[in-house]
């Protein structure tokens, strides 16, 4: 898929956040690439299109964050978002692949639509939270498995990707190797050492987001440490 191990930076600025506004995501992405990022992840159609137009010549993971009243699933949760993402031509489309109740179509229906309508270069990434999610995503033939939602679901809220010397990541890696799937470590890799560890353990790529591109998160980490 990709010949070398990649370091992705997630560049997102959502409505209500201080950095939300025109061209901000492109500037964040440019700064990330100047610092060594080899791939990008972003949300919302206008940002995806802007990064594609910027022609950074790196792989881009695109998502749409959309809340629905009857479900906790918000990362590219329905066919509506999938159709929009395919249309952008973004190389990697990531969707929530957890086994939680979805707002509309089933995960199977969304995946089936992707494989029937995708552009030839497009790949599908499963944002997972548990081993059950991973096994189901492999059964559905996702191209890429991500640990993105570990710690961000009700069932995994007391766990993280870095717990017990990266035990979850190691378990997912074994499954991915057995099934010849590309593994992206994402979710809570908030230090350079965490990111290096993920790649050293065997992940094909690592995504770092808040710890690089969200000043409020970085400031909060400092503040809490200072006041602990």
Swiss-Prot record:
Function per UniProt: Converts N-acetylmannosamine-6-phosphate (ManNAc-6-P) to N-acetylglucosamine-6-phosphate (GlcNAc-6-P).
Keywords (A to Z) from UniProt: Carbohydrate metabolism, Isomerase
Top-level EC class as recorded in UniProt: isomerase
Pathway the protein contributes to: Amino-sugar metabolism; N-acetylneuraminate degradation; D-fructose 6-phosphate from N-acetylneuraminate: step 3/5
EC number: 5.1.3.9
Family recorded in the similarity comment: Belongs to the NanE family.
Gene Ontology CC terms: cytosol
Protein name listed in UniProt: Putative N-acetylmannosamine-6-phosphate 2-epimerase
GO biological process, one term: N-acetylmannosamine catabolic process
A Pfam short name: NanE
Lineage: Bacteria, Bacillati, Mycoplasmatota, Mycoplasmoidales, Metamycoplasmataceae
């Amino acid at each position: 898929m990709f010949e070398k191990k990649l370091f992705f930076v997630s560049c997102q600025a959502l409505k209500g956040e201080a950095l939300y506004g025109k061209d901000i995501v492109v500037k964040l992405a440019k700064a990330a690439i100047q610092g060594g990022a080899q791939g990008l992840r972003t949300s919302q159609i206008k940002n995806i299109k802007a990064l594609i137009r910027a022609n950074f010549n790196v792989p881009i993971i695109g998502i749409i964050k959309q809340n629905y009243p009857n479900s906790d699933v918000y990362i590219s949760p329905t066919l509506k978002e999938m159709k929009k993402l395919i249309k952008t031509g973004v190389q990697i489309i990531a969707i929530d692949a957890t086994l939680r109740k979805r707002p509309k179509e089933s995960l199977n229906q969304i995946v089936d639509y992707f494989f029937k309508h995708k552009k030839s270069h497009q790949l599908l990434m499963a944002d997972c939270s548990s081993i059950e999610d991973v096994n189901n995503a492999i059964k559905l033939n996702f191209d890429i498995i991500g640990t993105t939602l570990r710690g961000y679901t009700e069932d995994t809220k007391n766990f993280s990707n870095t717990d017990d010397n990266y035990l979850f990541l190691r378990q997912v890696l074994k499954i991915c190797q057995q099934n010849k799937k590309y593994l992206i470590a994402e979710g809570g890799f908030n230090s350079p050492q965490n990111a290096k560890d993920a790649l050293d353990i065997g992940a094909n790529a690592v995504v770092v987001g808040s710890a690089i591109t969200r000043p409020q998160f970085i400031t909060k980490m400092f503040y809490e440490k200072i006041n602990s």
